[in-house]
Structures are given as structure tokens and as C-alpha cells.
Amino acid sequence: MAITMDDTISWIVIVVLVCFSALFSGLTLGLMGLDLNGLQIIMNGDNEEMAEMAGKIAPLRENGNLLLCTLLFGNVVVNAYLSILMAELTSGYLGLAYSSLAIVIFGEIIPQASCSRYALQIGSRAVPIVTVLMFMFYPITKPVSMVLDYALGDELGTIHSKTELAELLRIHVQQ
């Protein structure tokens, strides 16, 4: 079986789709794990570099449900197209197996492990891409996010009781 130019282009598209899957998955965990209160604390802190990164992310997080819907919608579309393309290039079941393996390892596990540790750094660099995607998907994601806003109410930041704050301080002193 000879590899054609169309096949080569398809494999390049597959690599790009896996990269976008990784981006969506990692950012979903990374950005949604940063609440507005935490970002405000970082922005008011003494580390200027971290404050700048938090300042870039905060406007996205102010529309948390829209951000969530955008990232999830993008991830689903990319992963569905990846599976279809892989199935066309291989036998159906083999394509399903390959696409599932690629999505789990390169589109989920690795990016989520990375973005959970480096959410500010990765998230702040991805703000321009996410902003474009929010604009592109807006007609679909905005109505869904409005339903979530109505059903769930305003997003609450992390609020600690006095006991929890005392324990948090104790843990920080020990580290």
C-alpha cells in the first residue's frame, strides 16, 4: 500500500488534532482549577511575573461557564474528527483503537498532568488562542453557558472558614 499525498496530509492533520485535544484537555483542568479569588491573591502578590500571568487569565475566568463550554465543545469536536479521520485511514476498529490511545495518552493524561502543575504559565500563554476559540464557538457555547449560569448561579471562589485558614497557614509554615 503506497502512501499518497492525501494520506500524508491526513496524518499531519491527525497530529494537529491531537495537539488541539491536548490543549483543550489541559486548559480545561488548568484554567478551571484557578478560581477568581486565587487569581486575585496572585495578582496582588509580590511576584510580578505570576501577577501578570494571573492578570491575563482572570478575564477568561470571569466567564467561567463560557470558558468551560468552549473548552469542552472544542475538545469533543476535535476528538470526534480525530476518530473519524483515523477510521478512514485504517480499518474502522483499528482507527478507533489508535485514536482512543492517542487521545487518552497525548490528549488527556500528559496535558492534564502538565497543566495541573503549570496552570498559570500554560494558561497565560494560551489566552490569545482561547479568546479566538471563544469567539468562534460563541453562537453554540453562549446559550449553553447562560443555562449553566441560570441553573447554578454565580461562581463562588474558594472561601475558607477561620479554622481552615488557620490550618492553611500551619501547612504553609511547615513547608
Identify the residue ranges that each predicted region occupies.
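Membrane-embedded alpha-helical segments of inner-membrane proteins
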Residues: 1-175
